[in-house]
Amino acid sequence: MVEINNLTKRYGNITAVNNLSFTVSKNEILGFLGPNGAGKTTTMNMITGCLPPTSGTIIVNGFDISKNPMEAKKSIGYLPEIPPLYTDMKVYEYLKFVAGLKSVPRSQRNEQIRDAMDRLKISDVSKRLIKNLSKGYKQRVGFAQALLGNPEILILDEPTVGLDPNQILEVRKLI
């Protein structure tokens, strides 16, 4: 599903990721561990097509992310470290907007949104403005948007940041 070959990212003289190779098959979970600045987020940004590599290849569901980015991205649900939320939107409106961006068929949007909100336990705040939510709720809204479209691949950067201990357990179960 994800194949990384000789992936490198340099910023001038600084090498953030150096010759990284790995494969993740269907139903596998892979976690990156390392200190701050080790290249974990940089690697995830390259896999999702948000950041071009200096060299190497990234194959997502059979598509090279640099040659067929739109096809590769259709398979990915991404929760960045800081979710890019439109804070002046209500939770449900935002998720509906994202579902449209992800080309979720109109006939399936409401069901997928309800399912994602139920799974992340955010249904009770669906009519609230995102800017008025706690950090934990904002994180869960970001996670919910990653689930829309039923992606085959989830890439989650620090998915439990800002969550309380019970929420952390729930998210780990979901993963």
Pin down the residues of each PLM region:
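Walker A (P-loop) phosphate-binding loop of ABC-type ATPase nucleotide-binding domains
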Residues: 35-39
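Conserved ABC ATPase signature
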Residues: 129-133
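Conserved ABC ATPase "signature" region
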Residues: 96, 100, 107-125
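Catalytic Walker B motif of ABC-type/P-loop ATPase nucleotide-binding domains
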Residues: 154-158
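Hydrophobic anchor residue at the start of the ABC signature
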Residues: 143
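A short, proline-enriched helix->beta-strand linker immediately N-terminal to the Walker B motif
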Residues: 148-152
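Conserved ABC transporter NBD signature motif
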Residues: 56-67, 71-76
